[in-house]
Amino acid sequence: MNSEQQYIDLYRDTREQICAHSADALNAVRDAAFADFERLGFPSRKVERYKYTTIDKLFEPNYGLNINRIEVPVDPYKAFRCDVPNLSTSLYFIVNDQFRQALQPKENLPEGIVVASLADYAKQNPEFVAKYYARLAKTDEDGITALNTMLAQDGLLVYVKKNVVVDKTVQVINILRSAVDLMVNRRVLIVMEEGANAKFLFCDHAADDSQYLTTQIIEAYVGANASLELYCMEETHYKNTRVSNVYVEQQCDSRFHHNVITLHNGVTRNRLDVMLKGEGAECWCNGCVIADKTQHVDNNTLIDHQVSHCTSHELYKYVLDDKSTGAFAGRVLVRHGAQKTVSEEVNQNLCATKTARMYTQPMLEIYADDVKCSHGSTVGQLNDAALFYMRQRGISEKEAKLLLEFAFVNEVIDQIQLEPLRDRLHYLVEKRFRGELSKCEGCKMCK
């Protein structure tokens, strides 16, 4: 049985159970997504945006699915603690794909922000969710999006109303926990109305050594003059596979900051699509990858300048050790009429060993003549002259390499605007390079 067929058969056999444990607004697009998946299947390497990762191989194992929504017997608010110094957040949890609510976080947030289970909110406000759900994540264009849409039953809903400023960072801990190998299909819907301002920190963690396959779709609507900061940290283990698609729509004078940090994983495939639909919109998209052993990390981005006077900045850096593999493909599209566009795309990569591999493909596609756009990429090893200089001053070879690697990724970490998180990442990255870090020391499962 090929990879696609097992999921086609699964949906046909369990459609009623899937729908019964979800919400009508999510179920309304489920059959159309199934038809799209039947037609598209998994994207092959012949598809330009998937040329560096063999997707169908990732979905071959027979993972379990929690279709009947059996609750994992853990209270994350009692079992989990985040001890990042000076980081004050309003804390929420998603266990696998089930949102866990507690009473205390709401007390830390102003009126005008909703953080809730996507399925529960859709049952109470079906028209609102139907207006936004699966509108940016088009199932007829991407097989992964179609698969997630046909199987996802719950996730996270964030709604920030007009002119509401959320000073406290909203932290969402995605915990993977299961006694058996598990597939998790998670959805996140973020709606920022005009003038809204909020910051979100998503942290991925595995609480055990089971093998996980996670598909995640994030749809974010950023209204006029709104500001969204989205920080995503992956700290799982080598048996974890994560396929994540993020779709963002920005209106006039909006601002979007996206920072993705991969410190531990097995296979990670991230897709980021940002559509600049209103004049004056700005986005900053940054990524830091530290990989070793046989890790594989693939970041694929599209910045779509649809109107004039928009700005985009991209900076992705990789440090690859052992037999790890990295890939970056970034496309900047400047459409007809998108004059006065300013865009900069940079991908810099460091292969610490001869067996590490990096594939890079920055792309500019411009159909306007009054623009200022640049792109570039580099792949190399540590500078021998710099190493020699440091060795001559009594620094050991190991310490010299560590200092150079740390300085290399420091530029990306410094883009993080949350100062406590930025300081913590400086510490974590240094320990990661020293081989002393197997997981985020600030995040602890309490026995």
Where are these regions (language model features)?
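Short, low-to-moderate order helix/coil transition modules at the start of elongated helical scaffolds
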Residues: 1-217, 225-227
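Conserved beta-strand/loop scaffold segments within soluble protein domains that form the structured core
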Residues: 111, 121-395, 409, 413-447
